[in-house]
Design a protein with these regions (language model features):
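A structured beta-alpha segment of the ubiquitous adenosine-cofactor-binding alpha/beta core
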Residues: 1-52
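Active-site-adjacent "lid/gating" segments in soluble enzymes
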Residues: 43-189, 193-196
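Short, cationic motifs built from Arg/Lys/His that form the positively charged side of catalytic pockets
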Residues: 5, 36, 54-56, 100, ...
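Aromatic-enriched alpha-helical interface/lid elements that frame and gate functional surfaces
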Residues: 173-232
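Active-site-adjacent beta-strand anchor residues
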Residues: 11, 33, 137-140, 187-188, ...
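Conserved N-terminal glycine/acidic-rich loop preference
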Residues: 28-31, 69-73, 221
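A generic secondary-structure signal for well-formed alpha-helical elements
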Residues: 28-29, 35, 39, 54, ...
Length: 232
């Protein structure tokens, strides 16, 4: 992700190199940092210092848990966030342990949210009051925001969704099926017209009028039976 970008390495414990960073800050639009909250202030690089050098500076602060709150002082890491957000609890198969994503998911979401926040802050600099802003980006909040519907359900019912593997809790069919040639097919047909087209495509038009599969709600209830038919 750093292709075609110029880079510089500075030892911020060295007073002379710290001054070089301040010189860069004075002529930059954005500064992005991901130290544990409070570390920048310890080095004499708090928001007040940075924006006194450049009042138009936008500062993006990326951390595990945010700049405020009971976990703010704790180190953050994507794996911790992917577990504590509830994502791992929902990911995987019902008869197995929770599953972490095979990529840096929390970091990626935080990067996207951070970029949007920085763009909005730059817009304010250019067309608003001309002052820089601080964008507080927490890995936890970025990933947790994608689970909003899960939080609403838990608040309303006191129950959490269970792991469903490749299936969805509220639509069917949705799964990955093994094919005769050893390859796999990802399939989702929750909309009624899509299911009817699927039934025709696999040569099973009678499924359309099968009482077990008349509606999406029916198909969710009988998803195991439907999965077996599709797998065969």
């Amino acid at each position: 992700y750093g292709r075609n970008k110029r880079s510089i390495v500075l030892n911020l414990k060295d007073p002379e190199e710290l001054e070089k960073l301040k010189a860069l800050v004075s002529q930059s639009d954005v500064l992005v940092e991901n130290f544990v909250p409070g570390k920048m202030e310890e080095m004499g690089l708090g928001v007040d210092v940075l924006q006194s050098l450049n009042p138009r500076l936008v500062i993006a602060r990326v951390s595990g848990w945010g700049q405020t709150g009971p976990y703010a002082h704790k180190p953050g890491f994507g794996t911790l966030v992917e577990a504590m957000s509830g994502f791992a609890h929902l990911n995987g198969f019902p008869d197995r342990e929770p599953a972490l994503p095979p990529l840096a998911m929390a970091d990626m979401y935080a990067g996207i949210y951070g970029a949007f926040g920085v763009l909005a802050a730059l817009r304010n600099v250019e067309h608003g009051d001309g002052k820089g802003q601080v964008v507080d980006v927490a890995l936890f909040e970025s990933l947790y925001s994608t689970l909003a519907s899960e939080a609403v359900k838990f608040q309303a019912t006191g129950t959490a969704n269970r792991r469903m593997g490749n299936q969805a809790i509220n639509t069917a069919p949705r799964n990955i099926y093994a094919c005769a040639d050893g390859k796999f097919l990802a399939l989702s047909a929750s909309v009624q017209s899509m299911f009817e087209n699927l039934a025709q495509a696999i040569g099973r038009p009678e499924l359309i009028d099968d009482r077990r599969f008349l509606t999406n709600e029916d198909r969710v209830i009988h998803c195991q039976e439907l999965n077996k038919i599709l797998a065969d």
